[in-house]
Every structure is written in structure tokens, then in C-alpha cells.
Amino acid sequence: MDTVFQFTMPTKIVFEDGAAFHAGDQVEGESVLVISDPFLYQSGVARKIGEGLGGRRVAYFSEIEPNPSCESVDAAAHAARDAGAQCVIGLGGGSSLDVAKVVACLVSNPGSIYDYYGGGTKQLEHREAQLICIPTTAGTGSEVTNVGVFTNRNTGKKVPMLSPLFWPDIALVDSTLTHTLPAAVTASTGMDAFCHAIEAYWNRESQPMCDMLAMRAMKLILENIKTAYDHPQDAQARRNMSLASMLAGIAFSQTRTTGIHAVSFPLTVEFGLSHGEACSITLPAFIRISEEKKQKKMRELCGWLGFADVPALAQAVEDLMRSMNMRTRLHEAGVREEDIEQIVQVGLEAAIIQLTPAEMNRQTVTALLRSIL
């Protein structure tokens, strides 16, 4: 094989039911900040994690919103500095985990996220605080990536931020935390994981290691997501979905994502879709055009997943989404014909769109979106 690639994955993974409640076995230092959303704090989950930290000093920041803003990052960083945090634990979906990555850096790097993000001129120099990520959904894979995505309220745009300092030291993947997910969240985060996997697989920067992980992740999701949706206490289905999400996260951490995620940013910011919904609503349409530059590879994937061809795979994915009451047409999310031009414009501004295995320009993206309006 003449393929040349690099693969970097420095995060220690602990994949075990119950591991989250023994996080103290992994923590270094005596002062810990646990970052979560309000629900995980109010329901007692965050405090239960804190109680398993072996008597260390624990502070909590529980104000993380979906699609977190830079202001939330700065507020959490202020809490971490006040606590003298030697360890930052991100607990939750991708929003909390992404915030934890930046906060762990801002403990020892002065200023605001705005100094380092977007138009900021500073570089994150080092990270002294330990970073542990504990996912409570099976979807984002953020526990094994070095990227965070944040909403800049000044511009109204949602933009990724990457740094080698964002790799978590430890990912504690405990599928029992997903047993109480609402059905809609199980569906949207699970299909987000499928997007991660297929975007890594068909990516113009794909590589053999990622292909292997992505293929396994896709098969696990197709075999388990409906069971997890219909029977939320099915431990094996939940475990398989957590595994799939993690594998997909590792895969796209190396390749980045493609057009699905590029177009999702304006759908989230302007139309209020969750990240998983914003990605999955265009998934079948992107599958249908994936043969343009990856015909042989996509046919191999269809064989692995048990489908005759790419159209059959696209239809099966759309049918699966419908069976979980997910939207598959843009008008169902409030998008009108006159909105498409702006969605296309923002999507094309994301560099990752050019990693899609098809020509991505104003005409082709407009046609794709109109096909699912």
C-alpha cells in the first residue's frame, strides 16, 4: 500500500460501566472543577461524580448551554481560576466537553477565549491542568478529539477551534450514563456519530486506520440505535452505541468532518436545531452524492453494511431516521426557499466543506439543499 498518513491519539481511554463514578482513581491534583450543563447538576449526576473523587476539593460550573458561547467558556475559566483547578472534568454532551478543553488551557493561559479564537492573536502555550472528559451521550465523540466548537455571539457564527492541547488526558466512557437519555437525544446524538463515521470514511483525507474505525462504528450504530431508542435500558445496545461514538470520534479526529458539518453550522445558529439534528437532516442527501469521487470505496462500504448500492444505503438511513421521528426535510425545521442562499454562503465559508467527496460550490450545495427542502 502506498498510502502515507499520520495517526495521533494520545488520550487514555477507560471504557467501563460505572467508571465515571470512580473518576478519583484517575485524577491528579487536589483541586477539581466539574463542568456540566444545569440538568446534570440539578439531577445530582455531577455531584455524584464529585463524591467519587476521593475527598478532593471540588467546585462545580453548571451553566453550559447547547452550542456553547465564548462567554460561557470565559465564565467557566473564571470559575476554574478561582478554584485553583489542577484538574478539569468535562461531564455531559459535546458542549460541556468542548468547554472543558478550553478551560483546562485557560487556567494557565491568561485572558479570554477571544484572545485565542477566531480573530484572536495569541496562541495557547501550554496546559497545566489535567483534562478528563466523561460523555453522557453516545454521539459527539468529543472525549477523544482535539477540537471544540463554539458560538461567537459577536458574529453569530459557530466555528471550530483546534489545538494539540485539547486532547483529553483521559476519556472515561461509561455507557450507564446514557440509559436515561430522552429518546430524541438518543436518536440525534446517535446519528451525529454516524455522520462522524461516514464523513471520516469518505473524507478526502481518509486513511486506513480511520476507515477501519469508521466502518465498525457505522455497523454498530445501524445495528443498535433503534434498540437503544425503543428500549433505553438495554445495556448492550447502550454499550455498543457508546463504543460506536468513541470509535467515530477517533476516526474524525484525524480527518476532520466534511460538508454535512459545514452546512450544519447555520442550521444550528439560525434555525435552532440541535447539532445532531442539523447534521443528520442532510445526511441522506450527502450519501446520495458520495459516489462522485469515491465510487469504489462507497460500494465497499455498502457491502460491509449489507446494502446493494449507495441509493439503498441512503434510503435505509432516511427510513431509520423517520422511524425515530427525526426530520429529513428542511421545511420541517422552518427553512424556506429564500433561506437557502444564506445557508449555502455560511456552509461554503467552512474549510471542511472541501473535504467532501463531491464538488462543493454554490451551485452544487444549493441543488443538494433544494433536493431536501
Curated annotation (Swiss-Prot):
Q: Which reaction does it catalyse?
A: 2-hydroxyethane-1-sulfonate + NAD(+) = sulfoacetaldehyde + NADH + H(+)
Query: MF terms per GO, please?
Result: alcohol dehydrogenase (NAD+) activity; metal ion binding
* UniProt KW keywords: Carbohydrate metabolism, NAD, Oxidoreductase
Which EC numbers characterise this protein's activity in its record?
1.1.1.433
This molecule's function is given as: Part of the sulfo-TK pathway, a D-sulfoquinovose degradation pathway that produces 2-hydroxyethane-1-sulfonate (isethionate). Catalyzes the NADH-dependent reduction of sulfoacetaldehyde (SA) to 2-hydroxyethane-1-sulfonate (isethionate). Can also catalyze the reverse reaction, the formation of SA from isethionate in the presence of NAD(+).
- Give the family, as the similarity comment puts it: Belongs to the iron-containing alcohol dehydrogenase family.
The record's annotation in PANTHER family points to:
ALCOHOL DEHYDROGENASE (PTHR11496), ALCOHOL DEHYDROGENASE 4 (PTHR11496:SF102)
Protein name (database record): Sulfoacetaldehyde reductase
Native source species: Clostridium sp. (strain MSTE9)
